[in-house]
C-alpha cells in the first residue's frame, strides 16, 4: 500500500512539474514577444499529432476551441522546451494579430536556446532558419 501511495504521489508531483515548466516557457514567450494572451493547454499525444498536425511535425498550435497545443509525447527531451516555446510564440502572434510570422518564430527559438546556453542546438536551429527563410524572394501576384 505504501508503495502504491508513493507511486501516486510521484506521478502527481511529476505532472505538476510538467505543467509548471510549460507555464514558465509560456511566460518566457510572452515576455520575449511583449504580447499578452491567456495560457492555453498543452496536450501530449503522438497519435493526435499524427492525425491533426502537418505531416512529419512533432507538434502544432490549433486555434479552435479557444486554442491549444498538441505535442508528441515522444519528443526528444532536449527539443521539448524550444519546440513548446515556438508553438507558444505562434499562438501569441496569432491570438494578437491573426497572423504568424514563421521567420520571427524561428529567430525567437534560436535566441531562446542561446539565452538558455544550449549553443549546439541554437546553431542547429539557426541553420534551419537560414535554409528556410533567408535570402528568399517572395513574389506576389
Predicted features along the sequence, with ranges:
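Classical Sec-dependent N-terminal signal peptides that target proteins to the secretory pathway
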Residues: 1-21
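Auxiliary, metal-adjacent structural segments of Zn-dependent hydrolase domains
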Residues: 22-71, 76-77
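Catalytic Zn2+-binding segment of zinc metalloproteases
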Residues: 87-101
